[in-house]
Amino acid sequence: MKNMTVIIVGAGIAGLYTAYKLSKTTTDIRIIEKSDRYGGRIYTYKDQYDVGAGRLGKKQKLVMKLIKEFNLEHLIVDINPNKNYYVDEKMLDEQGLLKHYNSNYKSLSDLWSYVINYKSKLDLKQFTFHNYLGSFMPTKEIKVLERSLGYINEMYRLNAADAIYTLRKDFDVENNDFFILKGGLSILSKSLYNYIISKNIIVDFNTQLKDIKKDHIITDRETIKYSKLYLAVCKKAYVSIPFFEPYKDIFDTVSVGNLLRIYAKYDLNKNKWLHNLKKTVTDNKLQFIIPITDDLVQISYSDDYIATYWNTL
């Protein structure tokens, strides 16, 4: 039986980052990964477009710190914060959207800032974000918030407390300051992977965790003793491990959301409409239209039941 100081299950960005941080104090680390690649949900297809995670925010402090540590600042490409909104068969800009619903706010930033900083005496975990908005916002302003956000999950599924945290920290609805990395977000996971490999940290691909015991794990290849064990996996992986069966009720309180990207590549000579195309939030099943390059467009980016709809066609 092998002995390791640290075992990490999962070679996605969370597992790689865990190994990176722990390597400052020990390199006696082994990562096991069930698939044949690292990066998890961060995956850039042929260095052209991101199939998984698609953007990063400058409010994500750990991400920004990591980019600086790996000297990747020169690869940052800021995303144009200006969007169009396709509502009731009309293409509107920000001011057009506000005017369409007779909003009392001068900008979406002002509206979102008021909402996420509003002090309420309600227990926010007892309301969806949409229901919570109804407790203090006029219907016309809620419509603007719905149409400008575009996402179903954050508006209708999350409790208000989690939604506000997500909207402030991840969605940055006040500043809308996002970026991509030239060459794809996989550059970040590649940098982490190359670093830990340079420290002689072992990554076992195509290795499935079968069960966890008090001082060892069992994989489909071998049994390994550990001093410390870290799991960087998704809910589905947790509930498949016998060790966690007693905690099934707790895991069942967590739901996993759906996201789907549909890409299309166009001949620029025949599709002049692509020129200067802005990111567009729609009120139909396309949900989001996001230009990637001059000839590559994400013709639909959807979540929740709309993502399920496209997946079942």
Predicted regions and their residues:
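Glycine-rich FAD pyrophosphate-binding loop
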Residues: 23-46
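Short hydrophobic core segments
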Residues: 7-9, 32, 209, 217, ...
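N-terminal Rossmann-like FAD-binding beta1-loop-alpha1 element of flavoenzymes
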Residues: 4-31
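C-terminal segments that line or cap access tunnels to active or ligand-binding sites in enzymes
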Residues: 233-313
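Conserved Rossmann-like nucleotide-cofactor binding loop
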Residues: 14, 37, 236
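A short alpha-helix-loop-beta-strand transition element characteristic
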Residues: 63-85, 121, 139-148, 271-278
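Active-site/ligand-binding neighborhood in enzyme catalytic cores
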Residues: 116-207, 215, 232, 237-242
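Dinucleotide-binding Rossmann-like beta1-alpha1 core, especially the glycine-rich loop
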Residues: 48-114
